[in-house]
Amino acid sequence: MIETDKLATEQRIIAATPASSHEEVFERALRPRQLDDYVGQEKVRGQLEIFIEAAKRRSEPLDHVLLFGPPGLGKTTLAHIIAREMGVNLRQTSGPVLERAGDLAALLTNLEANDVLFIDEIHRLSPVVEEILYPALEDYQIDIMIGEGPAARSVKLDLQPFTLVGATTRAGMLTNPLRDRFGIVARLEFYDAEQLSRIVRRSASLLNAQIDPNGALEIAKRARGTPRIANRLLRRVRDFAEVKADGQITAAVADAALAMLDVDPVGFDLMDRKLLEAILYKFDGGPVGIDNLAAAIGEERDTIEDVLEPYLIQQGFLQRTPRGRVATLLTYRHFGLSVPDARRTERDEWDTPDGK
């Protein structure tokens, strides 16, 4: 991906990844601190309540936890909540940072009893580091090499019992041996508008922003099912309201603010619309191959596949078929277009998920 594409992708207001270190600081201030305050993911939350309480009653570390799902849904927040509910310390790192076995060994040997080690992007661990992790997870021991050459020898170190919480957006990239060592595996799902509305109201309260239920719902409906996006939109709408509406966030104020930001009623921005409009107007609704589509809109193939398409497919606006990408009936309706008869009759032929 060229730098301009990367910059445009990272600066999207509806991007699910953190835009900057400043935004990460802002997110930390809004994070719930206990399970009772955590909105959504009821099934996961209910399971963790049971497992955490059972571990505390037995004075044991919680079993190792794998959290996976799209970015921005609260995996890091849950890791912090787990540590707080267990009453232990949390040590945080990420897969790409742990380049050498010694990096991981230094972390593990400094953990206190029952502490939580949180590894974000755990699918990006190097094979060397992963090999060190296996005995640590199973037996609370690690083997380290001392010395070099013929004089090198392996020394086994005992570790304090601990809980590993791993987070990933790409569970399929985890190796089977690593995945099998997690006793608790939880998938986080996209949030519905009502859940996001509750998150927006809670965040607004923490920010001392005046918002009514309809204003919160308007923001929630455009947040693409993602709390991180909802909180980011809230910040921008709050700015707009303070300048244009005496600080009061109503549905009309939120609508005007988000229209100014080019975020439409279903959460599409200019890049989403550019892709869908290219399929509709340049390729008659599709099918169109990914390389032709990338050339038509001036984006890299990887940007389309990894950044733009997932939400459009998940929401039913785009299909991947063996013959290429196809705009759905929902897309025609969204842009106020009538569906050509040819699209209606050919639709069944394209109704497969694996088109390239």
From Swiss-Prot:
Binding site for DNA: 301, 320, 325
GO terms for cellular component: cytoplasm; Holliday junction resolvase complex
Residue numbers binding ATP: 30-31, 72, 75-77, 138-140, 181, 191, 228
Enzyme Commission number(s): 3.6.4.-
SUPFAM superfamilies with a match to the protein in the record: P-loop containing nucleoside triphosphate hydrolases (SSF52540), Winged helix' DNA-binding domain (SSF46785)
Stretches for region Large ATPase domain (RuvB-L): 4-191
UniProt subunit comment: Homohexamer. Forms an RuvA(8)-RuvB(12)-Holliday junction (HJ) complex. HJ DNA is sandwiched between 2 RuvA tetramers; dsDNA enters through RuvA and exits via RuvB. An RuvB hexamer assembles on each DNA strand where it exits the tetramer. Each RuvB hexamer is contacted by two RuvA subunits (via domain III) on 2 adjacent RuvB subunits; this complex drives branch migration. In the full resolvosome a probable DNA-RuvA(4)-RuvB(12)-RuvC(2) complex forms which resolves the HJ.
Task performed by this protein: The RuvA-RuvB-RuvC complex processes Holliday junction (HJ) DNA during genetic recombination and DNA repair, while the RuvA-RuvB complex plays an important role in the rescue of blocked DNA replication forks via replication fork reversal (RFR). RuvA specifically binds to HJ cruciform DNA, conferring on it an open structure. The RuvB hexamer acts as an ATP-dependent pump, pulling dsDNA into and through the RuvAB complex. RuvB forms 2 homohexamers on either side of HJ DNA bound by 1 or 2 RuvA tetramers; 4 subunits per hexamer contact DNA at a time.
Record protein name field: Holliday junction branch migration complex subunit RuvB
Gene source species: Burkholderia cenocepacia (strain HI2424)
